Amino acid sequence: MITRVLITGANAGLGKETAKQLASNSEIGKIYLGCRNMEKALAAKLELEQLTGRSIFEVLIIDVSNQVSVVEAVQRLDCSVDALIMNAGGTGGKNFNKINSNGVTEIFAVNLLGHSLLAQELLKAGKLLKVAIYAGSEAARGVKEMGMKRPELPTSSEEEFAMVLFSKKHKMPLSHTVL
């Protein structure tokens, strides 16, 4: 049974809607809203509590594009989670090729590397018990700001394809369900 869930990118869009939908399940006892901005996270928490009538939401500040932030967030997590929904990410907007301090593009850092590190750190700490789901979607829709059309590929971006491969690699030896 899944009772505790961590959702990255949970202050808006699909992440917030996922939190709302999960809260409708009475078996869910805690939903960590993984967000990089405290003000937006607290606003989302308040809105979700009002919409659902449940006080099961807890803010976990995490910027998945920043390796230090990811490691520190896992250390601050006060208990294990049954499910990790890796939703944070995006397209990078007009600066999608900007190189970060780790020598990779911001879009690659947030859409793949950060989530990979998050899953690894949670597993290493014994804080991810059952399932990890990669839920990135921006590239699947295409982004007009970048002049992108909707892709016609089976996977919607290189980052998503890489995450699928990462997930498959870790599925068997860890005996966790990874979708």
At which residue positions do the language-model features occur?
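Rossmann-fold NAD(P)H-dependent dehydrogenase/reductase core
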Residues: I2-L179
